[in-house]
From Swiss-Prot:
This protein's name: Malonyl-[acyl-carrier protein] O-methyltransferase
Pathways per UniProt: Cofactor biosynthesis; biotin biosynthesis
Superkingdom as given in the UniProt entry: Bacteria
Catalyzed chemical reaction(s): malonyl-[ACP] + S-adenosyl-L-methionine = malonyl-[ACP] methyl ester + S-adenosyl-L-homocysteine
Keyword Transferase: yes
Molecular function, one GO term: carboxyl-O-methyltransferase activity
InterPro entries listed in its UniProt record: BioC (IPR011814), Methyltransf_11 (IPR013216), SAM-dependent_MTases_sf (IPR029063)
Enzyme Commission number(s) of this protein: 2.1.1.197
Gene3D superfamilies with a match to the protein in the record: Vaccinia Virus protein VP39 (3.40.50.150)
Organism this protein belongs to: Haemophilus ducreyi (strain 35000HP / ATCC 700724)
Keyword line: Biotin biosynthesis, Methyltransferase, S-adenosyl-L-methionine, Transferase
Family the UniProt entry places it in: Belongs to the methyltransferase superfamily.
CDD domains registered for this protein in UniProt: AdoMet_MTases
Length: 258
């Protein structure tokens, strides 16, 4: 995968910090599904958990609402998220011990004492998704759980079809092979999410507010936006207006012993 400008990506996410949760409909559904996947595969209490790329804390809240966690380490590229996320945690789960590690998760070295490593809608931005699994295996105790999602190559295919813009996502088979190196009892579940919008312009606003357009470096002019909207309406109309498809792959693995 070509290296992404992570500083630019982080800056664009932060620029829509206060609006992200309002527009991140698919991402919130993914977070809910990840917690369900974890619940279906373990009933253990996690003494130490690590969440990579916590952002505004939506996965954090959902995990703590249903999963017993004693000590939670949060990570994100930007520390601006931490006070808000910490406040949410202390309001609902005041007994949970929380700390924060700022920085690029691909460059940080985590301690080797975690029971759970989680990451929601984050790994697709990494330069080396496979290395993420190696790092997770390093950070986990034997029997520890890695829980995360990526997206299939068909993700946001409507946008890619019209613009040629998109990330290079590993396939489910690639993920399965990578997981099998350090993890067992692996679960990989594809659950497409089709969102509907009133108009193509609403699609563009959704993408901008959720940071998905961070992969594109150049803003569009008025003519390009008008042309995109005409083509989108022609190709992807539905009864509710137009649609946009996310294709998440939910994944869970248990670290092998030895």
């Amino acid at each position: 995968m070509a290296k992404l400008a992570k500083q630019l990506i982080a800056k664009r996410f932060v620029s829509h910090l206060t609006e992200y949760d309002q527009y991140a409909i698919a991402q919130q559904q993914i977070n809910h599904q990840l917690v369900d996947l974890l619940q279906a595969n373990t009933d253990k209490t996690f003494q130490r958990a690590l969440e990579i790329g916590c952002g505004t804390g939506n996965l954090t809240e959902k995990l703590l609402a249903k999963i017993p966690i004693e000590h939670l380490t949060l990570n994100d590229f930007n520390a601006i998220y931490y006070p808000t996320v910490l406040q949410k945690i202390k309001q609902k789960k005041p007994l949970v011990v929380v700390d924060f590690m700022q920085g690029d998760a691909e460059q940080l070295v985590f301690t080797r004492n975690f029971d759970l490593v989680s990451a929601a809608s984050v790994v697709q931005w990494f330069d080396s998704p496979q290395q993420f699994l190696r790092n997770s295996a390093y950070a986990l105790k034997p029997g520890g759980v890695v829980l995360f999602n990526s997206f299939s190559p068909l993700n946001l295919q409507e946008i890619r079809q019209l613009t040629g813009i998109g990330l290079n996502y590993p396939t489910r088979l690639q993920w399965q092979e990578w997981l099998a190196q350090d993890f067992e009892q692996c679960q990989l579940i594809e659950q497409p999410i089709k969102l509907t919008f009133d108009s193509p312009l609403a699609v563009l606003i959704h993408l901008k507010k959720t940071g998905v357009t961070a992969v594109s470096n150049k803003p569009w002019n008025r003519h390009q936006i008008k042309q995109f909207c005409m083509e989108y309406q022609a190709h992807f109309a539905c009864e509710q207006g137009v649609y946009l498809t996310y294709t998440p792959i939910l994944m869970l693995g248990i670290k092998k012993n030895g």
